[in-house]
Amino acid sequence: MVDLRYGSGNIFDEKVHEIGIIALGSFLENHGSALPIDTDAKIASYIALNVSIITGAKFLGVVIPSTEYSYVKHGIHDSIEDVITYIKYLIENGRKIGINKFLIVNCHGGNTIILDELSKLNFDDCFIQMESVCLTHAATEEVSLGYAVGILSEDKMKTHNPKIYEEIGMVGLKEAREKNEAIDLEAKSVEKNGVFLDKTHGKSLLNDLITNYVEIVRNMI
């Protein structure tokens, strides 16, 4: 048996090796013209990996399936069961390398509907916590955050408009607005204020999010 040096490297504490970080977003979802279709997965992965590097917790990768409310039609999504099955796979393999606490960094609002099923995976010797970043879809905050991460095309901001791309702010998603008051309120805000790139806010937001998740890991030790 090899004697592993758990105290090596830049880590918070040796116990951080018991914590695994999982990114959760979406891969197939329209985000206007300036952001890619896998925006949520890339932002979640960026945050999760950076938190792993800062704390020493293990980055376990990104969940490929994603889910969504049935009335939100701006991409291709999977069932809740598909998402849970993939997470279970990561957890089962994470436990084989000594992980018993899992932090899921979720950056897709539709994935919040897995929470009830996800809670069933918690046991005395296995703790799972999902913390979500839910921004107005493809609007100012997500555009600015995308810039900070490095996935935004500034040139394409010229056409990044809800009048052209209905999913921006979900302004043109009539059924979603009718069935979800929160979505409708966000859409009205986008209609009123528009969408613009705020580079300073994007960098600040990214830094704050990473810092917040680092604190969550610290509290899990």
Swiss-Prot record:
Domain of life from the UniProt record: Archaea
One GO term of the biological process aspect: F420-0 metabolic process
UniProt keyword terms in alphabetical order: Hydrolase, Iron, Metal-binding, Zinc
Pathway entry: Cofactor biosynthesis; coenzyme F420 biosynthesis; Cofactor biosynthesis; riboflavin biosynthesis
Residues the record lists as binding Fe cation 1: 29, 40, 108
Cofactor(s) named in the record: Fe(2+); Zn(2+)
Residue sites binding Fe cation 2 per the record: 31, 40
Catalytic activity entry: 2-amino-5-formylamino-6-(5-phospho-D-ribosylamino)pyrimidin-4(3H)-one + H2O = 2,5-diamino-6-(1-D-ribosylamino)pyrimidin-4(3H)-one 5'-phosphate + formate + H(+)
Entry's cofactor comment: Requires one Fe(2+) ion for activity. Requires an additional second metal ion that could be Fe(2+) or Zn(2+).
UniProt keyword Ribonucleoprotein, yes or no: no
Enzyme Commission identifier(s): 3.5.1.102
Enzyme class: hydrolase
GO molecular function term, any single one: 2-amino-5-formylamino-6-(5-phosphoribosylamino)pyrimidin-4(3H)-one formate-lyase activity
PANTHER family: 2-AMINO-5-FORMYLAMINO-6-RIBOSYLAMINOPYRIMIDIN-4(3H)-ONE 5'-MONOPHOSPHATE DEFORMYLASE, 3-DEHYDRO-SCYLLO-INOSOSE HYDROLASE
HAMAP family according to UniProt: FAPy_deform
Family: Belongs to the creatininase superfamily. FAPy deformylase family.
Stated role: Catalyzes the hydrolysis of the formamide of 2-amino-5-formylamino-6-ribosylamino-4(3H)-pyrimidinone 5'-monophosphate (FAPy) to form 2,5-diamino-6-ribosylamino-4(3H)-pyrimidinone 5'-phosphate (APy).
Quaternary structure annotation from Swiss-Prot or TrEMBL: Homodimer.
The protein's name in its UniProt record: 2-amino-5-formylamino-6-ribosylaminopyrimidin-4(3H)-one 5'-monophosphate deformylase
Protein source organism: Methanococcus maripaludis (strain C6 / ATCC BAA-1332)
